[in-house]
Amino acid sequence: NSIDTALYSGVILTHGSDTLAYTSALLGMYFRHFDIPLFIIASNKPIGEKGSNGLFNFTSAVGLIKEGKYKGVFTLYERVMLPTRVIPADTCRDRFGVYGYDGFNDFSVFSGVSENMLSRPRERIFHNDVKFGKRVLFIEGYPAMDFGCFVPNEDTAAVLYSPYHSATACTDVSEGKSYALTEFIKRCITKNIMVYICGLKRKVPIYSTVAEIIKAGSIPIYTTSAVAAYMKLLLAYNQEEMPVKEVMGKDLFFEEVKFS
């Protein structure tokens, strides 16, 4: 917050690769207003070790800053990516993905976000430092899930549930209420804890179970990666400058992939 951007051509933040996607999403949303390039970079291996891409990522960031082509926050790891769409690296080849990117049909990894859109001035929303005292419970869906295993504590401000790609989940109570997401949602709401469901698509017919999940009181987060949704919730519930609902309703820095 204390950086006078008029004094610099750009900023390079070196970061560990394990949590690169998470920090990238958070900084992209918080520093959405940056009028100079902020590149977040990492390395797959220690600098100097054979096969390390760290020096390439660093020199690429320096070169792009000198070009003056980009304005705003970006992640640079072998390619330039929107920070709010970076998917954590796989555990096999340490390669990061881009949420919503269709390699066959997308000319750019920015997926529908033009350079003109990126260059437009953006309103500064967050002015104060944020202390992350409130927690968000992050649950990823899988078969035979028992929601009785999840007990939000007093520091839990919200729950994020990341479902299958069709956004479906078990709502059947015949085998027991603890297996139904709808019952878990109701249990959380009685404790004044809201449950958010990420990855839903706008203007797409939904399955009956998805309708039940929303009817139970959950809040949808549309076409946003689980990583970006999680960090957005952490930011929304811990900042004190605007209502949570207003933060969650804004597309802060292209985290929502919008289809034409």
Where in this protein do the model-derived segments appear?
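Active-site histidine-anchored catalytic micro-motif
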Residues: 1-260
